[in-house]
């Protein structure tokens, strides 16, 4: 972004000047969110700010950001439909994400080859039962490395729901009612309990560690890891010895054939004070 800002300032020298400030954000949203909230209260918001996807509607409803009314259809056409949908509130576009995100089931090709495991294609993902059998096959291979079949963590903040939402959805579960107003009977549904118990089976069978082990997959001591799309770049740049593959997410034995993945991204928006 610094390069883009420098190019902008060079192009519009003497007419406009842009500056950029990077503010760290922790897993619970603190730091950056605290700074923005304080700026809202003081009326000192910057002209352009980044907004996390789930917060766009609230920012728009409260008049913190303004519609991007001057964008043409041609300009909007270069963005994914999911990005346009994320940034739209009450039929008005308020924010645009520079990227999209999703999750993947990452695997170590060398470990799976040694265990004699073949990876299915996107149209025929492993079911829960099938994946359990796969974990059973790879466990002896990773035990020789003092590792686990699965590098699966449940971090605080938003990451846990983001990573594992497809498990719940493929089993017919959800987190809130369709109108967004109810949790009881939805979050604690029979389907969601089945999903949580499936996670528990990984611990019960010793396929994952009971405590988080840093870089377990990246160090070649785990066969699988569920993570975001950003993990690919991290592994390629920092762990080049990992023979990385990406498999479709595991689906429930009761899978209805639907495709489920979380999406969403930080987006750019213009504050309401911007002219």
Task: Show where each model-derived region lies.
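Paired acidic/hydrophobic, glycine-rich loop segments that form the ligand-binding mouth/hinge
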Residues: 47-50, 223-227, 245
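Glycine-centered hinge/linker elements that transmit conformational signals in sensory
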Residues: 132-137, 173, 178-210, 249
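Short glycine- and hydrophobic/aromatic-rich loop-to-beta-strand nucleating segment
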Residues: 104-107, 168, 268-270
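Hinge/lid segment of periplasmic solute-binding proteins
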Residues: 51-104, 113, 129-134, 143-146, ...
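Aromatic-glycine-rich donor-binding/catalytic loop that engages nucleotide-sugar donors
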Residues: 110-123
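Extracytoplasmic/periplasmic substrate-recognition and gating elements
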Residues: 10, 14, 115, 193, ...
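Short helices/loops that flank or line small-molecule/ion binding pockets
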Residues: 30-44, 62, 112, 132-137, ...
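Conserved N-terminal structural module of periplasmic/extracytoplasmic solute-binding proteins
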Residues: 1-58, 71-78, 91, 120, ...
